[in-house]
């Protein structure tokens, strides 16, 4: 499943996991993407939307 929001374009953030001994390994933080049926124009479509867009009301479900 895609880890990019279809509404705002938010994607994963990249960085390092740092242990107590300060060994570092690459990791990524994915946004909380949900598949919802949303109205695009007059037709319902399945979109991958992040939860911050859902909470802000940027998507009309249908």
Swiss-Prot record:
User: Its family?
Assistant: Belongs to the bacterial ribosomal protein bL28 family.
InterPro entries xrefs: Bacterial_rp_bL28, Ribosomal_bL28, Ribosomal_bL28/bL31-like_sf, Ribosomal_bL28_bact-type, Ribosomal_bL28_sf
Q: Which GO terms describe its cellular component?
A: ribonucleoprotein complex; ribosome
Q: Which organism is it from?
A: Parafrankia sp. (strain EAN1pec)
Which ranges form a coiled coil? none
- Write out the entry's keywords from A to Z: Ribonucleoprotein, Ribosomal protein
What is this protein's record name? Large ribosomal subunit protein bL28
- Which domain of life does the protein's organism represent? Bacteria
Q: Enumerate the SUPFAM superfamilies for this protein.
A: L28p-like
Task: Name a biological process GO annotation.
Answer: translation
- Name of encoding gene: rpmB
Q: Name one GO molecular function term.
A: structural constituent of ribosome
User: What NCBIfam families has UniProt attached to this entry?
Assistant: L28
The reply to whether Calcium figures as a keyword in the UniProt entry is no
